[in-house]
Every structure is written in structure tokens, then in C-alpha cells.
Amino acid sequence: MKPTKQILEDILDEVRPLIGQGKVADYIPALACVPNDKLGIAVFTNDGEMLTAGDATECFSIQSISKALSLTLAMELYQPEELWQRVGKEPSGQAFNSLIQLEMEQGVPRNPFINAGAIVISDMLYSRFSAPKHRLLEFVRKLSGNEHIIYDRVVANSEMDHSDRNASIAYLMRSFGNFDNEVMPVLKNYFHACALSMNCVDLARTFGYLANKGIQPGISEPIVTPMQCKQINALMATCGLYDGAGEFAYRVGMPGKSGVGGGIIAIVPGEMTIAVWSPELDPSGNSLAGTKALELLSERIGRSIF
């Protein structure tokens, strides 16, 4: 079955009672004030159709969803052996901002989707781009077709003001020789990436290339190669939802990437991209109602990579 607007609206009605059972991220003050009752979903198909329901056009902080975009840029800039000697490809099983595993493994992060891995990727982008913030924003605007996407400076500054743990991660990696630049400028770029302000429609369209073998619908040139597309999806399937990746694979069965702003992007290779948003999180830092919505959608339309 193909998704329809009615299916999306029915699913949101079913998951709405979950609101109140999760917790909005409060360790970043600018995120703590987001209303907890927001709920939206968008589906973008490879033939260009967009379906929406709920608060699909309301912007929010995409947070760690941006890590998949930063990885995409890094894969364009670096040879595989350069990239993967600095960050791994394995699930961590630890919290996304853990220091313990990082020290045990000599400053090499388990994967690009935990904080340590994304900070290494930011360091690599900082080495190759003269203006990495501008380059990422330009890239996202191109993919989404929305020239009005911006960084939320309030969120970025809030993260910078509460950056002790991420700074500790960066300095620990630097002590092991896995960091090339000054820490604070790299972190500033990292926090701006997390502070991209987008909505479900923007996100679903932006990640269309991952459902289409690396080619963005509506853009003639490939964004990544088919092999790179497969690799990014594989990493999202195994590592994209922190220490809740296994649970998400079991329930939803799609490659996905979440953020503590309450957004989740999910990919149905060859068919469609789905973006969902609900700010309340489960204990792993993933959207509670958003995960349930994707689970129900997977069941209703009969889609899974497994």
C-alpha cells in the first residue's frame, strides 16, 4: 500500500495520546522551552510527491539529524581510508555523549552519529572548507529547495554556553592525536550544524537522495555515489538512533537518524523519505511519539528493509 494523507492523519491521531509520556530535552535551555504537544509528519516520494499531516511545516532544531548531512559532505571530500581511520562504523551501545568508550578506544569514535564521531567529522570539514558553516547551509538549501533555511542562533549560542561535555570529548580526542584544529572554532561549527532550523517538509525533501541511490529528485547531478548511499543508509540503520538503534530497527525497520529536537528522518530505499517531529523524547533521546508514528506507518504501508 502507498502512503496517503489520510493514513498519515490517522497515525498522528493514534500516537497523540503518547504526548506527556516523554520528556523534552532540557540540557540545552533553548530546546527546553519548545511546546511538547507539537506533532508532524511528511513523506517525500522519489517521483516528487509530498504528503503531510500535523505540524509538518513548523520549524524546529534538527540537532543530530545534521550529522548525516555532515557525513555526506565528508565522504565527498575524503578518500574512504582517510575518513574511516578517524571514525568507526560500529554501534556504540553507549549514550550519545559518552566519554568512557572513547577513552578505552584511543580517541577513535565508534561511528559518525554519536557526538564524538560528528565532532571528528566537523574537524575534518573545518580542515577542507574555508567557510564550513556557509558550505553546509548552502548544501541544505540546495537539497531542500528552500533558500530560507537558517541556523537558529539562539540554539547555537545556548549549546555553546553549555558545551563542557562536548569540549571534553574534543580535547580527549585531541590528546590521542585524532583532532587537527583548534577545538572551540570546530565546536562552534558543530553546534551551528545542530542548530539548523527546518521542518518535516524540508527534511523529507533534503534526504531524498538517500532513497534514490544518491541522486536527489529534481537535481540532475548525483549527491553521492550509489555505493556511498548504501553505506550511509547502513550506518543509519545500525547507528542512527544512539543506543536505541536496535529497538528502532526492530519496530520500524528502516534506516533512520534522530535528533534531540524531536525529529527523525527515515528512509525507504528506492521509494520514499519520511520525516517526523514530536519534541518529547524517550530515555535514549529519540522522539517517543515520532518513533511510534514510524512504526505504525511501516505496518500500514508494509515497508521495511528487513
Swiss-Prot record:
Matches recorded under Pfam families: Glutaminase
EC numbers, comma separated: 3.5.1.2
Highest taxon above the source species: Bacteria
Keywords: Hydrolase
Binding site for substrate: 64, 115, 159, 166, 190, 242, 260
Known catalytic reactions: L-glutamine + H2O = L-glutamate + NH4(+)
Gene Ontology biological-process annotations: glutamate biosynthetic process; glutamine catabolic process
GO molecular function: glutaminase activity
Keyword Hydrolase: yes
Record carries keyword Hydrolase: yes
InterPro entries: Beta-lactam/transpept-like, Glutaminase
HAMAP family recorded: Glutaminase
Family: Belongs to the glutaminase family.
Subunit relationships: Homotetramer.
Name under which the protein is recorded: Glutaminase
